[in-house]
Amino acid sequence: MKSAIFAAAVLGAAGVSAHGYVSKAILDGKEYTGYLPYEDPYHNPPPERIFRKIAGNGPIEDLTSIDLQCGGWQNSGSAPAPLTAEPVTPGTVQKLQWTTWPDSHKGPIITYMARCPGDCSEYEPGTDAVWFKIAEDGKHDDGSWASDPLINDVPYEFTIPEGLAPGNYIVRHELWALHAAWTYPGAQVYPSCFQVKVVGDGTQQPTNLVAFPGEYTPDTPGVVYDIYQNNEPYPIPGPPVWTPA
């Protein structure tokens, strides 16, 4: 009950402005503007992006919804973007800048990739198991969370795995907010997808592929977690991070 009362106060204070999305990516040093849900649809023609459309700055709470994949609408949960980023090199650090993030919205940050069978601008994964996890960060030993640096507008950094075979890929990046996750539904997932071309001489193809929706259920460890009263380590949802052999 205490968790519910405290979270209600947090939610009331935070309001809609507490929500967010990826506003830009810096990939191999080149800057790409994210999909801007409150600007792009009102341009004629809309600007072409490497990011797939999102409905707005709000979260996904229904883990069975196709919107969980990339944050789109029900009829186009991961509608392809018209552009693909210029080639990126495995082993390099990439950066994602979020809009201002509230300090009440604690949670993990998880990043996946999926190989496109051809041009990513013509590919929708649907519910196929095509995703592999490349990075995750959750609750730290000192009680801080992966999401905390975003409060100060610090970009999130991740690395394209070394050894990954060249090709066209979708990067699926998600931020969780657990301020109401003591029950299901309650956890808020903020997914974002963009398209990249990986180059290099890598030969490895990940296994242990998962689907979105499909991988997360109400019973998945980490989906229900009381950040106000649970002092145990946080189990990050999803499969293990893929590690090249």
From Swiss-Prot:
Induction behaviour: Expression is up-regulated during growth on wheat bran compared to that on glucose.
Keyword tags: Carbohydrate metabolism, Cellulose degradation, Copper, Disulfide bond, Metal-binding, Monooxygenase, Oxidoreductase, Polysaccharide degradation, Secreted, Signal
Cofactor: Cu(2+)
Chief localization: secreted
Example GO molecular function: metal ion binding
GO biological process: cellulose catabolic process
Family per similarity comment: Belongs to the polysaccharide monooxygenase AA9 family.
UniProt protein name: AA9 family lytic polysaccharide monooxygenase B
Taxonomy of the source species: Eukaryota, Fungi, Dikarya, Ascomycota, Pezizomycotina
Gene of this entry: LPMO9B
